[in-house]
């Protein structure tokens, strides 16, 4: 009983400090699960909305906020298979509000910015320059937004688009204020801050040992350190890849299968940098199934992991993305250590020549 009261007091202290230091940016994780079902948007988007509408201890306010978030998603979220239906409604009504991932590019020939809608399938939509100036993440991979669209077809402007962006509002953190984060961190002890970090990724620290807490925090290192390479092997369905797919908008999870040097590092035809130049962290799920179509793919990956750079053609390129390899093991660690090797399934990646001889 005493331990329970101590735990509750500790939670109350942390919650109060969070409200004082990060008001409007904290959210109950159990609410995310209620809304996630049926909404195909990343967890960090749901949490941003919940932080806006449910930042209260009053059950009635929280319930109203959850209903508001559900209504917003139901009314405005664009599913790719309903894109034409949404465009038809936009044409009929003259205006419509959508939730979609927006990427902005600068059209150098015409000297203005253009927006691209991921699910709606729209490209080359003019957008006011105030938005990329204010939310620079629009230019670097895109962000999820609520967008108010107008539709006005003009006969004399047949070459233009009838669709215009009236207002754009990000529904994920468009940027991180490091100074604010550092200032707020000063109010917490090390143990309290560890608990905050773990709860931020959906883990309950009160059920974990001190060692388990540190192991889970190690998972986060590739998200904040440049060129930090990590391999995690464990039983199936234990949440190893969840962190890299759902928690951060700056990481990408590549499902196991074939990949190419052009996709991962550099496309010599288009002169564009691949995933390592676009994301803070590139994670590979089911790493045992990864295969490169290019013969030199594994060697280029090794060079990049060792030095943070790679050579393609006549140029050497540098990037800062960390790499994470997530894989499954089908036996207990104790049994594997006695009878085999934890990394046996990765031989074809690390030593392709030797693997061919073994086969």
Model-identified regions with their sequence ranges:
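Short amphipathic alpha-helical surface micro-motifs
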Residues: 125-132, 149-153, 176-181, 235-236, ...
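Extended, charged/polar low-complexity intrinsically disordered regions
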Residues: 2-200
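Conserved ASCE/P-loop NTPase catalytic core
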Residues: 204-336, 342
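A generic structural micro-environment signature
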Residues: 123, 155, 203, 207, ...
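Residue-level detector of conserved catalytic or cofactor/ligand-binding positions
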Residues: 345-358
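Short acidic (Asp/Glu) and glycine-rich catalytic loops that position anionic groups and cofactors
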Residues: 173-176, 279-284, 350
């Amino acid at each position: 009983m005493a331990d329970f009261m101590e735990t509750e007091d500790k939670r109350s202290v942390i919650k109060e400090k969070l409200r004082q230091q990060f008001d409007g940016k904290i959210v109950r994780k159990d609410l995310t699960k209620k809304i996630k079902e049926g909404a195909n948007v990343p967890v960090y988007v749901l949490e941003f909305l919940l932080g806006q509408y449910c930042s209260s201890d009053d059950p009635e306010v929280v319930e109203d906020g959850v209903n508001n978030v559900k209504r917003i998603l139901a009314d405005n979220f664009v599913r790719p298979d309903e894109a034409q239906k949404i465009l038809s409604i936009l044409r009929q009504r003259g205006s419509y509000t959508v939730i979609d991932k927006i990427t902005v590019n600068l059209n150098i020939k015409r000297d203005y910015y253009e927006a691209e809608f991921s699910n709606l399938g729209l490209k080359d939509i003019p957008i006011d320059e105030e938005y990329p100036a204010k939310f620079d993440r629009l230019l670097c991979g895109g962000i999820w937004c609520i967008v108010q669209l107008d539709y006005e077809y003009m006969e004399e402007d047949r070459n233009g688009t009838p669709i215009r962006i009236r207002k754009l509002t990000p529904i994920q953190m468009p940027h991180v204020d490091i100074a604010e984060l550092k200032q707020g961190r000063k109010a917490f002890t090390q143990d309290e801050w560890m608990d905050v970090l773990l709860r931020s990724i959906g883990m309950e620290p009160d059920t974990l040992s001190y060692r388990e807490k540190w192991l889970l925090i190690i998972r986060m290192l590739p998200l904040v350190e440049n060129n930090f390479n990590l391999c995690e092997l464990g039983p199936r369905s234990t949440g190893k890849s969840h962190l890299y797919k759902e928690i951060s908008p700056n990481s990408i999870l590549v499902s196991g299968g074939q990949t190419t040097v052009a996709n991962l590092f550099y496309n010599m035809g288009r002169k564009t940098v691949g995933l390592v130049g676009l994301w803070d962290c590139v994670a590979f799920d089911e790493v045992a199934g990864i295969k490169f179509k290019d013969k030199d793919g594994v060697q280029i990956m090794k060079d990049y992991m060792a030095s943070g750079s790679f050579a393609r053609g006549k140029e050497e390129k540098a990037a800062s993305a960390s790499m994470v390899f997530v894989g499954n093991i089908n036996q207990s660690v104790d049994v594997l250590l006695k009878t085999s090797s934890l990394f046996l399934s990765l031989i074809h990646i690390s030593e392709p020549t030797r693997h061919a001889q073994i086969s």
